[in-house]
Amino acid sequence: MRIGVVGLGYWGPNLARNFSRLADVAWLCDASPERLERHGAAHPGARTTTSLDNLLDDGDLDAVALATPVLTHAALAERVLRARKHCFVEKPLAQSVEEGERVVAAARESGRVLMVGHLLEYHPGVEMLKQLIDSGELGDVRYLYSNRLNLGVLRPDENALWSLGAHDVSVLLRLAGEEPYECRAVGESYMQEGIEDVVFCYLRFPSGLAAHMHLSWLDPHKERRFTVVGSRKMATFDDMELERKLTVYDKGFDESFSSYGEYIARSGDISSPRVPNEEPLAIECRHFVERVQDGGEPRSGGEAGLRVVRVLEALQRSLQESSRAAPV
């Protein structure tokens, strides 16, 4: 399999490094000749160019990975797919549902694989958390919540919802196993007028499940945590932990046998199952290569990526409408 990587800023070189272990990185593309020279040295077999057209005109190129600015994702992904190349595009898929639908349609019409780089869905800890839910070990899931907090980086072109929320929405949808029908969001702009630095989100699902997100780049803590509260047990995935990334709490309420129908708190064992120490990006890139080879639908395929954009767009509407509930 021959693949080209487009965009050699912060993330693109990581994609090139991982894909080079799985396939032939045949092209590197970036608007900066200096970046091409610097990163091309690590991939001596790759041709370099400042024009995407050169990749699309290469009849022997199988796939293109896009790590370009968010505002270019949809347009470039559609071009790649229309040129009948398989496409890996970093998250989010698009900046609007309308854009995302065009990309998904291009993938369907071309018969090519479209995969969105929702990296956390490929983290072994998130996969183990999903297995805890699906196995019933946690009981009936009551609610989910996530915190993605840090001090910085302030972005002039997008708010905390769009900058940080794609990570958490993709994971919460995977853990929930369903799509929300309604959401609300409230945010505040402290550092830049009209650009929310902190956002609180609430998602409601058809099954009765609820999920909450706290997103902020104006916080003293660096936190990347997901919590699942079940009727039998509770569990957290904390990506900032080096050793105990996944923790299961045998905590909850047991109904007493008194005639008053009271509930008694239960605080049992706390366990930390071992999470395999494999780089999520390596797993993600391997998944893309395998789906190109077998023609299967990726875990974070076009439709899944579109679902994330649909939720983000609904949350943005709620932000703009004074936290009014917005249908998804």
Positions of PLM-derived features:
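A contiguous active-site-proximal alpha/beta segment in oxidoreductase catalytic domains
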Residues: 71, 94-156
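N-terminal Rossmann-like dinucleotide-binding module
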Residues: 1-43
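C-terminal capping/lid region of NAD(P)-dependent oxidoreductase domains
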Residues: 112, 317-328
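C-terminal glycine/acidic-rich active-site capping loop/insertion
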Residues: 119, 232-300, 324-328
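Hydrophobic residues in well-ordered beta-strands that form the structural core
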Residues: 50, 89, 114-116, 145, ...
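Beta-loop-alpha module in the N-terminal Rossmann-like domain of NAD(P)-dependent dehydrogenases
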Residues: 43-106
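Rossmann-like dinucleotide-binding domain that binds NAD(P)(H)
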Residues: 151-221, 227, 240-241, 303
